[in-house]
Amino acid sequence: MKFSSLAAATALVAGSVVAADLDPIVIKVGVRSALIPGWPKGGSKFFYKSNGTEFFMKGIAYQQEFSTNGTSSDKNNYQDPLADVESCRRDIPLMQQLQTNTIRVYAIDPKKDHKQCMKLLQDAGIYVVADLSEPSTSIIRDDPKWDDVLYTRYTSVVDELAQYSNVIGFFAGNEVSNNSTNTDASAFVKAAVRDMKAYIKQKNYRSMGVGYATNDDAEIRKDMTAYFNCNKQEESIDFWGYNIYSWCGDSSYTESGYDKVVEEFKTFNVPVFFAEYGCNEVQPRKFTEVQALYGDKMTPVVSGGIVYMYFQEENDYGLVKIEGGKPKKLPDFNSLQKQISKIKPSGVQMDSYKPTNTALSTCPKSSTWKASVKLPPTPNKDLCSCMVKSLSCVAKPSVTGKELGKLFGTVCGSDKDACKGITADATSGTYGAYSMCSPSEKLSFAFNQYYQHQSAKGNGANACDFGGAATAQKSEKPSGSCANLVDQAGQDGTGSVTSAPGSGGNKPDQGAASTISAPSVNLGIVKLGAYIFCAVLAGAGMILI
């Protein structure tokens, strides 16, 4: 729904190829500690790595507004705040006036150069928490998927930001499931959490957390929290961001429900912080919640928060208005500055911290929670490429957009068995091995399955056409690592592929990604099941049966 930020600290004298490194922030995380190299054992707090002082986020969401909350968007013209050096030079001094030690950015372009802005942030003692998605490449709540395109986007952001010591971690999703009608989408986000954690470990990057930012929906809040922190450590979040706007004007600890937040998370085993906060129903905002957030009742449980947001936009949440390239402080800025200057959060030292909350949560089983504990498979480009090369009938490269959706409806409506290997059902936890491939690759698999089934009946002569959308190709018999991958997937694509991406058919190391099932099928328009249903009603039997 909105944006947020993370934490800051003291700079080390030690140099780096990019800039003088800030003291990394580490997480004391109980059951996770044994599996995350470099992270101390036990607990649910952020600490400065060198001196062990507890770290509380005093953050600001820093990005021009766009939607990253699980809704569809074709926009790709977002502004990367970490690549705009002049804006960084202009804005960071104002952030320092608010004692900012963390910013949250919602979308960066991994192809751009971020060295100068990250250097300016490091020099100012400011850390970064970055969302992995961008407006046109994110997990959509009403048509979720976890595929090659998303995997490539997410890993490219990790690759780009891993070089900076002032990056605390990443959000794999922001308010994707936001009510009881779309909880199944959380399975795809949790698969992204699992795979990014495994990727960071596989690349031998320094310790960086992968978390999720949730909205404050009373109906699904508890189930959501439990789901992202249950079953297996390697697929559970490393920190939990809470977008909360319940404290408006001169509210109170109890009236706002902050007391319930503390009660709910007092035994949680990973750090919790407000990923967005700052109700604007009363203006100018008074930010009196700052005293509660950093006071003695909340700091034992909540590790600070991120104010939404720096820039003044149409939504009227801004601290600063940019006019003619120059910043103008708004009344909200002055209110926040006044409140933040009063706080002195008291924490604990890492060495003396004795956590008792180390267990994972129990997975939700309520009637309103539809996401299975069985997650979509890890995207595997090698598997998809090997599969397409092995086919005799494939989709033409010219088939795109809405035509893809219609063709899925046609082939799956005519032969449901042809689509078993590409469908994904996050409620039942059933995923085809190729459900994480690109739409074109999935359509090629379905076309070929239909063609093979018709050929077995003696009807193959015209079965690879689909109105000119399909074409025959000379198939390649899989060999070597390709043979291993395709064999694991099975002839109909319903097998379980246990090879990690790029591993050439080898199983992942212990503690890396969990058994690969297969991410969801997103056709980009409507879910595949709906296409099948509509195609059957429309009489897709015009094709040979």
From Swiss-Prot:
One of its GO terms (cellular component) is plasma membrane. Residues 1-19 form the signal peptide. Residues 493-513 are annotated as: Disordered. Its EC number is 2.4.1.-. SUPFAM superfamilies: (Trans)glycosidases (SSF51445). Keywords: Cell membrane, Cell wall, Cell wall biogenesis/degradation, Disulfide bond, Glycoprotein, GPI-anchor, Lipoprotein, Membrane, Secreted, Signal, Transferase. A lipid is attached at residue 512 (GPI-anchor amidated alanine). It is found in: Secreted; Cell membrane; Secreted, Cell wall. (1,3-beta-D-glucosyl)n 2 binds at residues 175, 216, 221. Gene3D superfamilies: 1.20.58.1040, Glycosidases (3.20.20.80). (1,3-beta-D-glucosyl)n 1 binds at residues 106, 133-141, 174, 308. The GPI-anchor is attached to the protein in the endoplasmic reticulum and serves to target the protein to the cell surface. There, the glucosamine-inositol phospholipid moiety is cleaved off and the GPI-modified mannoprotein is covalently attached via its lipidless GPI glycan remnant to the 1,6-beta-glucan of the outer cell wall layer. InterPro entries: Glucanosyltransferase, Glycoside_hydrolase_SF, X8. Splits internally a 1,3-beta-glucan molecule and transfers the newly generated reducing end (the donor) to the non-reducing end of another 1,3-beta-glucan molecule (the acceptor) forming a 1,3-beta linkage, resulting in the elongation of 1,3-beta-glucan chains in the cell wall. Involved in cell wall biosynthesis and morphogenesis. This is 1,3-beta-glucanosyltransferase ARB_07487. It comes from Arthroderma benhamiae (strain ATCC MYA-4681 / CBS 112371).
